[in-house]
Protein backbone atom coordinates (compact mmCIF):
# COMPACT_ATOMS: atom_id res chain seq x y z
CA UNK A 1 0.00 0.00 0.00
CA UNK A 2 1.38 3.46 -0.85
CA UNK A 3 2.42 5.60 2.07
CA UNK A 4 0.73 8.91 2.81
CA UNK A 5 2.45 12.29 2.41
CA UNK A 6 1.05 15.66 3.46
CA UNK A 7 2.41 18.33 1.12
CA UNK A 8 2.40 20.98 3.82
CA UNK A 9 4.37 22.31 6.75
CA UNK A 10 1.24 23.73 8.42
CA UNK A 11 0.93 22.58 12.04
CA UNK A 12 -2.87 22.94 11.74
CA UNK A 13 -3.10 20.63 8.72
CA UNK A 14 -0.76 18.16 10.43
CA UNK A 15 -2.96 18.12 13.55
CA UNK A 16 -6.09 17.58 11.45
CA UNK A 17 -4.56 14.69 9.50
CA UNK A 18 -3.39 13.08 12.75
CA UNK A 19 -7.08 12.66 13.66
CA UNK A 20 -7.33 9.91 11.02
CA UNK A 21 -4.62 7.84 12.79
CA UNK A 22 -2.99 6.88 9.48
CA UNK A 23 0.81 7.09 9.51
CA UNK A 24 2.05 9.93 7.30
CA UNK A 25 5.00 12.20 6.66
CA UNK A 26 5.02 15.94 5.98
CA UNK A 27 7.07 17.50 3.20
CA UNK A 28 7.29 21.09 2.00
CA UNK A 29 6.01 21.55 -1.55
CA UNK A 30 7.87 23.91 -3.87
CA UNK A 31 5.08 25.87 -5.55
CA UNK A 32 4.71 29.46 -6.69
CA UNK A 33 1.44 30.53 -5.07
CA UNK A 34 1.02 33.71 -7.11
CA UNK A 35 -2.50 33.95 -8.56
CA UNK A 36 -2.82 34.00 -12.35
CA UNK A 37 -4.34 37.18 -13.81
CA UNK A 38 -8.13 36.99 -13.48
CA UNK A 39 -8.01 33.63 -11.69
CA UNK A 40 -11.16 32.99 -9.65
CA UNK A 41 -10.79 31.88 -6.01
CA UNK A 42 -12.06 28.32 -6.67
CA UNK A 43 -9.69 27.85 -9.61
CA UNK A 44 -6.76 29.26 -7.62
CA UNK A 45 -7.10 26.90 -4.65
CA UNK A 46 -7.73 23.93 -6.94
CA UNK A 47 -4.65 24.69 -9.04
CA UNK A 48 -2.44 25.22 -5.99
CA UNK A 49 -3.64 22.10 -4.14
CA UNK A 50 -2.95 20.02 -7.25
CA UNK A 51 0.45 21.67 -7.81
CA UNK A 52 1.47 21.09 -4.19
CA UNK A 53 0.60 17.40 -4.35
CA UNK A 54 2.24 16.81 -7.73
CA UNK A 55 5.37 18.82 -6.86
CA UNK A 56 6.47 16.05 -4.50
CA UNK A 57 5.93 13.12 -6.89
CA UNK A 58 9.61 12.78 -7.86
CA UNK A 59 10.65 12.62 -4.19
CA UNK A 60 7.83 10.23 -3.28
CA UNK A 61 7.24 8.01 -6.35
CA UNK A 62 4.98 5.38 -4.73
CA UNK A 63 2.85 7.45 -2.42
CA UNK A 64 -0.51 9.10 -1.91
CA UNK A 65 0.26 12.81 -1.69
CA UNK A 66 -2.20 15.29 -0.18
CA UNK A 67 -2.14 18.89 -1.36
CA UNK A 68 -4.32 21.59 0.12
CA UNK A 69 -4.66 25.33 -0.26
CA UNK A 70 -7.07 27.82 1.24
CA UNK A 71 -8.12 31.39 0.61
CA UNK A 72 -10.51 33.74 2.32
CA UNK A 73 -12.89 35.92 0.29
CA UNK A 74 -14.75 38.97 1.59
CA UNK A 75 -16.86 41.17 -0.68
CA UNK A 76 -15.42 39.41 -3.73
CA UNK A 77 -11.81 40.12 -2.73
CA UNK A 78 -9.20 37.63 -1.59
CA UNK A 79 -8.21 38.45 1.98
CA UNK A 80 -4.70 37.36 2.91
CA UNK A 81 -2.85 37.06 6.19
CA UNK A 82 -2.77 40.46 7.88
CA UNK A 83 0.83 40.24 9.23
CA UNK A 84 0.30 43.41 11.34
CA UNK A 85 -2.12 44.20 14.15
CA UNK A 86 -3.43 47.25 12.30
CA UNK A 87 -4.25 45.22 9.20
CA UNK A 88 -5.87 42.51 11.37
CA UNK A 89 -8.12 45.15 12.94
CA UNK A 90 -9.01 46.50 9.48
CA UNK A 91 -9.88 43.01 8.18
CA UNK A 92 -12.07 42.25 11.19
CA UNK A 93 -13.84 45.62 10.94
CA UNK A 94 -14.60 44.87 7.29
CA UNK A 95 -15.83 41.35 8.18
CA UNK A 96 -18.07 42.65 10.98
CA UNK A 97 -21.71 41.83 10.16
CA UNK A 98 -20.66 40.17 6.88
CA UNK A 99 -20.16 36.70 5.44
CA UNK A 100 -16.61 35.57 4.76
CA UNK A 101 -16.21 32.57 2.45
CA UNK A 102 -13.26 30.24 2.68
CA UNK A 103 -12.40 28.07 -0.31
CA UNK A 104 -10.21 25.08 0.43
CA UNK A 105 -8.75 23.16 -2.47
CA UNK A 106 -7.91 19.51 -1.86
CA UNK A 107 -5.92 17.16 -4.07
CA UNK A 108 -4.92 13.54 -3.57
CA UNK A 109 -2.29 12.38 -6.04
CA UNK A 110 -1.24 8.75 -6.42
CA UNK A 111 2.32 9.19 -7.64
CA UNK A 112 2.59 5.53 -8.67
CA UNK A 113 -0.50 5.44 -10.90
CA UNK A 114 -0.78 9.13 -11.79
CA UNK A 115 -4.40 9.17 -10.57
CA UNK A 116 -5.45 12.61 -9.31
CA UNK A 117 -8.57 13.46 -7.29
CA UNK A 118 -9.52 17.06 -6.57
CA UNK A 119 -12.24 18.98 -4.81
CA UNK A 120 -12.99 22.51 -3.63
CA UNK A 121 -14.86 22.89 -0.34
CA UNK A 122 -16.51 26.23 0.43
CA UNK A 123 -17.19 27.27 4.01
CA UNK A 124 -19.10 30.39 5.10
CA UNK A 125 -18.36 32.29 8.29
CA UNK A 126 -21.15 34.66 9.35
CA UNK A 127 -19.60 37.37 11.52
CA UNK A 128 -21.70 39.09 14.12
CA UNK A 129 -21.50 42.88 14.40
CA UNK A 130 -18.28 43.64 16.28
CA UNK A 131 -17.45 46.76 18.24
CA UNK A 132 -14.08 48.43 17.85
CA UNK A 133 -13.25 47.44 21.44
CA UNK A 134 -14.09 43.77 20.74
CA UNK A 135 -11.86 43.81 17.67
CA UNK A 136 -9.00 45.39 19.65
CA UNK A 137 -9.43 42.89 22.50
CA UNK A 138 -9.51 39.94 20.11
CA UNK A 139 -6.39 40.99 18.20
CA UNK A 140 -4.54 41.66 21.48
CA UNK A 141 -5.49 38.27 22.98
CA UNK A 142 -5.21 35.97 19.96
CA UNK A 143 -2.57 37.66 17.71
CA UNK A 144 -4.10 36.27 14.46
CA UNK A 145 -1.43 37.86 12.27
CA UNK A 146 -0.67 34.71 10.26
CA UNK A 147 -4.29 33.65 9.71
CA UNK A 148 -6.25 34.47 6.58
CA UNK A 149 -9.20 36.59 7.64
CA UNK A 150 -7.47 37.58 10.92
CA UNK A 151 -9.06 34.95 13.16
CA UNK A 152 -8.53 31.45 14.53
CA UNK A 153 -11.80 29.54 14.55
CA UNK A 154 -10.22 26.81 16.66
CA UNK A 155 -9.53 29.40 19.37
CA UNK A 156 -11.13 32.59 20.64
CA UNK A 157 -12.18 33.48 17.09
CA UNK A 158 -15.33 31.43 17.64
CA UNK A 159 -16.60 34.35 19.78
CA UNK A 160 -16.66 36.57 16.66
CA UNK A 161 -19.22 34.51 14.78
CA UNK A 162 -22.98 34.38 14.46
CA UNK A 163 -22.89 31.02 12.69
CA UNK A 164 -20.83 28.73 10.47
CA UNK A 165 -22.04 26.98 7.31
CA UNK A 166 -20.24 24.17 5.56
CA UNK A 167 -20.08 20.43 5.08
CA UNK A 168 -17.02 19.86 7.26
CA UNK A 169 -15.83 22.11 10.12
CA UNK A 170 -12.25 20.93 9.50
CA UNK A 171 -12.38 22.77 6.18
CA UNK A 172 -12.21 26.09 7.98
CA UNK A 173 -8.93 25.07 9.64
CA UNK A 174 -7.44 24.01 6.31
CA UNK A 175 -8.03 20.33 5.53
CA UNK A 176 -11.49 18.96 4.61
CA UNK A 177 -11.32 15.54 6.27
CA UNK A 178 -14.68 14.23 5.05
CA UNK A 179 -13.68 14.76 1.41
CA UNK A 180 -10.18 13.43 2.10
CA UNK A 181 -11.58 10.22 3.64
CA UNK A 182 -13.71 9.70 0.53
CA UNK A 183 -10.65 10.15 -1.69
CA UNK A 184 -8.53 7.81 0.44
CA UNK A 185 -11.20 5.08 0.27
CA UNK A 186 -11.15 5.35 -3.55
CA UNK A 187 -7.42 4.59 -3.26
CA UNK A 188 -8.14 1.55 -1.06
CA UNK A 189 -6.96 3.33 2.11
CA UNK A 190 -9.79 3.36 4.64
CA UNK A 191 -8.93 5.29 7.81
CA UNK A 192 -11.11 2.88 9.81
CA UNK A 193 -8.94 -0.12 9.00
CA UNK A 194 -5.59 1.41 8.01
Swiss-Prot record:
Q: Which cysteines link up through disulfide bonds? A: none
Q: Which reaction does it catalyse?
A: N(7)-methyl-GTP + H2O = N(7)-methyl-GMP + diphosphate + H(+)
- UniProt site (Important for substrate specificity): 12, 70, 154
**Pfam families hit by this protein:** Maf
What's its EC?
Answer: 3.6.1.-
Q: Which HAMAP family match?
A: Maf
Q: Which protein are we looking at? A: 7-methyl-GTP pyrophosphatase
Give the organism the record lists: Salmonella typhi
Q: Output the lineage of the source organism.
A: Bacteria, Pseudomonadati, Pseudomonadota, Gammaproteobacteria, Enterobacterales
